[in-house]
Every structure is written in C-alpha cells, then in structure tokens.
C-alpha cells in the first residue's frame, strides 16, 4: 500500500529542510519519538515531548531551531515540524487515493466454511479465516485480516490494513479504518495528515450499527478483547479501549484517549482527547469528560431538565460555588 523506504536526503529535499547527518540513511517508517527505532523518522512540535526527543532511538527527527540542543540523533531542520510531518505522511502514503482497484477477489474464499454474500468486494492480500461470514454489500480493503468465525453484517466497510480478531460481530453500515481528524496548520490553510496506522479489533469484539472507528495516524487504534460498542459510537484515531469495556450509543471518544478495562460508559457521552480513564470506571449517560479519571467509581455530568430561565440561574449558582 505504501512505498517502503526513502533516503534521508530525499526526505530533506522533499521538505525543503536543512539536513544534519547522514543523507544515505534509509528511512522506512514514521514513528512517535518513543516508538522510533533504527530506520524510522520522528518529529517534535511541542515542548512537552522534549524528554522524549532526548531519549529517542530514531534514525532522524524533524525539528525546529529551539530543539537542536536536545537532539542526539540526525535531524532535518524545518520551520514548522508539524506541517512538515503532515507533508511527510503524504510522501509515504504514495498512490493511496490516485487509483481505484476493480479486481474483486471475493470468489477466492469458498472453503473452510467461509461465506461471502452478494455484491461483497474483497481486495488483494486479504486473509479471511475459517467460519467467517460476510453479508451483502460489504467492502473489504487490501491487506485486511479477518479472524475465524467473525460475522459481518451488510454494508460494512473495512478500509485497507485493518485487523479483525476471532469471533467478532460487526453490524450494518459500520466503518472501520477511516482517517481520523488530523491536519496541520500552515497559516492560510490546513495540511492533511495522512493516517498511516491501522485499526486492530482483538477477539470477541462487537461493533454496533453505524459506528466509526478511525485508523491511527501512526501505530494502531485498538479495541481489546471483549469490547462492546452500541450503535453510532465514534472512536477516534489512536484510542485504546480496554478489554470488556462497554460503550453506549452515540458516545464519541476523541483521539489518543485510553479507556481502562471493564469500564461502563453510558450513551451520549463526550470524552476529550489525550486523557486516560482508569479500570472499572462507570460513566452515566450524557456526561462530558474533560480530564483523566484516576480512580474507579461512578461519574455523572449531565444536567437536569429545567425551563431555560431556571437552568441559567442554576448554572450561575453552580459557577459561583466553584469560583468560591
């Protein structure tokens, strides 16, 4: 799906950056600072990751001037590392949206109890294990893996490189592996960050109807064993949902948030990005969560229904109490 590698000098030229180091190094992946290793390139655009920069094992890093003294590996100096990272993802994504594959391999899967419904499209290099059933109108992209005895309802879309474990159930019209909300600001417009990661559903996961699970920008969005989603749940890029957690309808979880094991999250909740919710937490419906929850318990945040004038008075009193 993606070109395998580039020379560091090629990357520097593509970005219009200033290379410090060995331009002949081969770069095959983009990774976060802590995950990066030999053959990968990373980036830093926020000072809170300065310690990660100092500890990185990346072959090279995209940096701005303020981080030069903290970088112990080869680097490419650029004006805006976040924008340059976005452009680099576009380079690595290659021909992702430049052509459409019309070759359907659905007829290749007719043994081991596998059943493929009418008008199902299956891309190349797909692995479908025994006993799996895929209903009419579903789309299975290139390089997808589907574990044994999984049941896929009609009109499900699995984007390229998604991995589905054993005995999963995916209900109608759900989309797994779409891009997350990722853009870098370049002053007068937004530069798209191509999402080079994937989605991994472990074993015994159930996804309700019309859910969306976005692929990771790098790495994987993960739903661990036994996770259950109600209808119309949104899981953003790079989230990690702990095993046996249940999430009610129309809840939306923003990017890179980690939900612990055995949590119960009611319907209609909103959970912001980059927070962590501890194991065993219960969240009542319509709660808006803006910070990490560090101890188990039952949490609520919805407001009671009042006439609007009374609601305004109620909120004003509450605000004064918190201000005091």
Can you name each region flagged by the protein language model?
Residues 43, 104-307:
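Structural signal for interior beta-strand "rungs" in well-ordered beta-sheet cores
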Residues 1-107, 162, 167, 173-174, ...:
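Terminal amphipathic alpha-helical/low-complexity segments used for targeting or macromolecular assembly
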